[in-house]
């Protein structure tokens, strides 16, 4: 793979990762409520789900999912329901205990939240299936190129989520107690909204 092709892939990945999807909203909501550590752990969960979808795309499992609308909907609705549940809990706690900081999730829970938020978007497997052939050159080892693209994709996603978490946490730290309570509600609302948006998502027809 040429350096030019790799740079184009990284540029496309970076722009797409900047889009505020469920994983961005989850990590930002955790960071904006003061749980920076949980936000970083949730990022690992997101990357784990991404790695799974990337591997599935390489193995050709997109064809299996594409003919099974039931499998797509099950994954989507489970993820959407989970995001709506934790978002609602955050909002309820913020209203019922306005002076108290939100309870930080355990590392395992934060990891699972990140994984579910990303895994709830099965369209990722179609995206990877569509974009990989555009950058894998037939003159070089396909597996090495796929490995480079996969590692690059995860690194870019991790960097973008880390930057979102840093910015959100900085806003939280610079706020007054009153504003922090508002941010707690905003964080819950972000998750609630992302769950609703996810439930409205339709299966991609063009792989992107």
What are these model-predicted stretches?
Residues 67-96, 154-160, 164, 174-208:
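Selective transmembrane alpha-helices of multi-pass membrane proteins
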Residues 9, 38-41, 56, 75-76, ...:
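Small-residue packing motifs within transmembrane alpha-helices
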């Amino acid at each position: 793979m040429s350096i030019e092709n790799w740079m184009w892939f990284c540029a496309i990945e970076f722009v797409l990762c900047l889009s505020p999807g469920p994983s961005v909203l989850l990590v930002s909501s955790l960071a904006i409520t003061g749980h920076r550590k949980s936000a970083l752990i949730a990022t690992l969960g997101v990357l784990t789900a991404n790695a799974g979808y990337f591997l599935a795309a390489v193995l050709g499992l997109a064809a299996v999912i594409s003919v099974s609308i039931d499998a797509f909907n099950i994954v989507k609705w489970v993820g959407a329901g989970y995001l709506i549940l934790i978002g609602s809990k955050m909002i309820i706690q913020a209203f019922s205990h306005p002076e108290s900081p939100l309870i930080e999730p355990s590392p395992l829970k934060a990891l699972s939240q990140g994984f579910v938020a990303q895994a709830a978007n099965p369209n990722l497997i179609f995206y990877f299936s569509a974009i990989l052939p555009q950058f894998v050159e037939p003159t070089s080892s396909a597996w090495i190129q796929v490995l480079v693209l996969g590692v690059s994709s995860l690194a870019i996603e991790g960097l973008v989520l880390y930057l979102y978490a840093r910015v959100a946490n900085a806003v939280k730290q610079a706020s007054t107690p009153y504003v922090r309570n508002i941010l707690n509600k905003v964080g819950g609302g972000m998750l609630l909204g992302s769950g609703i948006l996810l439930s409205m998502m339709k299966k991609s027809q063009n792989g992107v």
